[in-house]
Structures are given as C-alpha cells and as structure tokens.
Amino acid sequence: MRILLVGANGFIGRHLLRTLQAEGHSLVATSRSGRGAELPGVAWLSLDLTMLAADPSHFQWPQGVELLINATGVLSTDARQLATVQDRGARALFDLAADNGASVIQLSALGAGEQPDIPFLASKAAADDYLLGLGVPAVVLRPSLVLGEGGASSQWLSRLSPWPLIPLLDTWARAQPLHIEDLVAAVLALLRQWPAQPCVLPLVGPDALTLPELLDQLRAAQGWGPARYLQIPAAIANPAVRLGDRLGWRALNTQVLTLARRDNLADAQAMKAATDFMAAPLTSRLNEWPRRELSVAASLRPVLLAVLVLIWWGTAVVCLGPGHEWGLRIMAEVGVHGWLARMAVVGGALADAVLGAGLLLRRWRRHALRAQLALMLAYMLIISLWLPHYWFDPFGAVAKNAVLLVATLWLLWTEPEVHRR
C-alpha cells in the first residue's frame, strides 16, 4: 500500500515509519523540514500544517497515495496554535485525502471529545468530528499515554524514576498507558482488518494505573524498589502552574495540572472487538526502555546544570562583594595593581555571571559550556605559571577544577541538538 505519513519525525511517527517500511509499504513521509530517516522506499516531503491551514495549495498531494496517517501533535498551551495545527491544518489535510480518494487514520488522544476545557484535547476532537463527517473511510484512533524510547512523556517519567522520593501533582488519578510497540501493532491490525464504517477507537493498555504505580513499574524494570511519593500541596502547585502558563512551560502548566488530576480511562475491549487486537500489559514491554544508566543521566543533568549555575553566579557575587579585596591581593601576586587589577576582578566576575546565565538559555548553552571550558583552562594555566603554590592548597580549590572540567565536557557532549521537524 502507498501511505502518506504526516508527522513522521515525531515520537509516534518515527516508530510507525520504520515498521511500515519493514512491512513492505511504499511511504511518503512528511516533516516541516522535509528531512528525516533515509530508508529504502521512503520519500520525504516538506509539510507545515500551519501553512496548510492558511493555504491548502501549500502541499501537493502525492500520486497514488491510498492511505493518510496523521501522526502530528503539538505540545503547547497556546489554544490558537493548537486550533491552527491540530484542527484547521488537519481539516485541510483531510480534505486533500477526500479529494484524492484516500482512507484516513487520525491519531488523536484519549479524552478528546470528553474534556473540552483542555485546549489540546478540544482541538483534537474538532478535527476528529470533521473527519468523521467527510464520508471517507476513516478511523480515529485515540490512544492513552504512549510510552517508549524517544517520547516526551517517557523522558519525563524516566527522569523522575531514579529518585527515592518523588513529588507529583497528583497521586490518585488513573490512566491506561501502553507501549509504543502496541500502538504500532494496532495500526497494522487496522490495515489488516479495516472497520466497515468510520469510527472512533480508544486504544488503551489493559491496566488502570495511578502515576505512582506507573513509576514503580518503571523503577522495577530498572532494578529499583518502590519509591515514596509526595503530592505537591495546592498552595504550591497552583502558583507554579500559573508561572508555567506565563513562561510557556510544557511540563508544568494549567493544562497539565488539570489532566494530572483526572482519570482518563476507556474500554480496552473496543479495539479488540473491531480488529481482534489488544495491547499487552506495560510490564511485558519494558525490556529495552527505560534503561537505568540513561534515566540516571537524564535525572542528574538538570541538577548538574543548576549546580554549575550556582557556582558561576556564586563566584561573581563573591568577587564583586566579600571577596573583592582578596581578588585584588591575588592580582598583586602576579604583578597587577591599581585600576587594572580592579578591572580584572570585576571583569572576571561579570564574565562568570554571563556564563552562568548562558547555561539557563538552551540556545546559548553550547556556547556557554565551551566558553566555560576555555575560561577554566585559562585560569588553571595562569595559576600554573604564576601562582603554582595554589595547587598545594590543602582544600584542593584549584585541583577541584578538574571535576568541573569533566562535568562541563559531559554536559557539552550530551547537550541535545535542536532540530526543526
């Protein structure tokens, strides 16, 4: 079958792409950049649903496509952006499919149509309803929380999993998570056994789990025992999510808090009745993900960044305040006095402050880490040449820079690239 896979660079799209290609299907894959994994039998095209919503002629429908799979989704709290991409952009895509006689699988989300106060779900539901009213062969697949390597929610959960005490927004709401392998298998089941009429199918795991129960399953898969959980008091959670709304945080905002406090459940038998497929228990899928060493690295990374920020800002404050005279005495030891010494101490403090701030901005983080490496090496070289006695400090103040060098290098090498999908 010739399939148009939209959103092929996303978490779900990447897994679908590889499996459908391995099954022998001819694929036209899209991303905003028009680039992605180079696989035999896969052609890449550029498609931006924001532009398609404004101009349906933005995208030329590929010849011979029999099935459209829409795997796009936007992690956003901006209701206008969600309506543009997930509703109007999807509608324009469905119109193209209808005009060209293609069937459609719409990957929606469990809860769409039932929680209109959640912009993410409301925009999905609007597109779902439009598709079902077009009169084309269509299936709206509404999966629960999908887990597996590379997913945003999966990364957040794996980052939480190593800690023995875990604070959560809610500890009682239940969901039915499933593994990405089961979502892919469900799509394959639809291709083998297409429903007679356009329909909505919930896709859920067989077990209803609270977030602590889910995290304990992930911990067990990595060799840890159960953790202890602390529900964040509303007096702390509510102001925090309002701040998240203002700053555009994806992991902490009003939408996330509302979802975290609600059950999101469905009948696992509905999918089985339609396609004879049912998702496996999550525990049976936790083989290659999560991986203990990656979870620990992801968990400690923000802690290490925060510590480095505090160190750089701390040295800046000390040099400008209580340690200023000490800094001048050190400059005198290398023969620098007067205004030049004061400029050197103040300039060094300001440089430290700027580098600490650079760590907080993702777009500047790589540059800041490289500059930190250069600055620390320069400091150590100057000390080695002109102030070698500082190497013999009983507290190892200079020698400890070796640890900071390694930590900074690790952060630089593991800093994720920002790609345009």
Question: Residue spans of the language-model regions?
Answer:
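Mid/C-terminal beta-alpha module of Rossmann-like enzyme folds, strongest
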Residues: L190-L252, A266-R301
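Conserved Rossmann-fold NAD(P)-dependent oxidoreductase catalytic core, especially the SDR/UDP-sugar
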Residues: T72-V74, T84-D128, L132-L134, A138-S144
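Conserved glycine-rich Rossmann-like NAD(P)H-binding loop of the short-chain dehydrogenase/reductase
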Residues: H25-R32
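N-terminal Rossmann NAD(P)H-binding glycine-rich loop of SDR-like oxidoreductase domains
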Residues: I3-E23
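NAD(P)H-binding glycine-rich loop region in Rossmannoid oxidoreductase-like domains
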Residues: G36, V42-A92, L96-A98, L110-E114
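Flexible, glycine-rich beta-alpha linker
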Residues: I118, V139-W156, L209
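A conserved pocket-lining segment of Rossmann-fold NAD(P)-dependent short-chain dehydrogenase/reductase
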Residues: R159-L178, D182, A186-L190, W194-Q197, ...
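Extended, low-polarity transmembrane helix blocks
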Residues: N253-H324, W339-V354, L360-R421
